[in-house]
């Protein structure tokens, strides 16, 4: 735990990030969630972070009001990520302390954050699993 207090995001983040575009379909996203077992994907357009999409965001697309007609599964899977992503995601910098990221995760109830450098480029992602791995070191 002692080392954790002094660590920065860059020391714990996942550097190779899988991303999706705003045009990715819900069906493609479902397959990506299954294949990679990630909870979140950054949404990129023209090398810019435009949002994030989580498993929870995806599952919300399957919810409908009881008085409405039930949409066909195939139609739901054609929805684009842009229709249900979080457009103003929280993000952190590589130089932020892990203790601050942990505090942000608790305050925002988010389990991951994209990591952007000073130029706004996506350089990684930090998850609660990344933090847990570091606590024991």
Language-model-detected regions and their locations in the chain:
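Tandem CBS (Cystathionine beta-synthase) repeat/Bateman regulatory domains
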Residues: 1-137
């Amino acid at each position: 735990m002692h080392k954790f207090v002094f660590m920065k995001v860059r020391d714990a983040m996942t550097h190779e990030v899988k991303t999706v575009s705003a045009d990715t379909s819900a069906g493609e996203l479902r397959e990506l969630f299954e294949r990679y077992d990630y909870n979140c994907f950054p949404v990129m357009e023209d090398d810019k972070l435009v949002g994030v999409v989580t498993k929870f965001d995806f599952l919300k697309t399957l919810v409908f009001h009881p008085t409405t007609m039930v949409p066909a599964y195939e139609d739901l899977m054609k929805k684009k990520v842009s229709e249900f992503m979080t457009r103003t995601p929280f993000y952190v910098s590589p130089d932020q302390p892990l203790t601050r990221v942990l505090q942000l995760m608790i305050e925002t109830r988010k389990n991951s954050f994209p990591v952007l450098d000073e130029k706004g480029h996506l350089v990684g992602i930090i998850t609660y699993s990344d933090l847990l791995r570091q606590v024991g070191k």
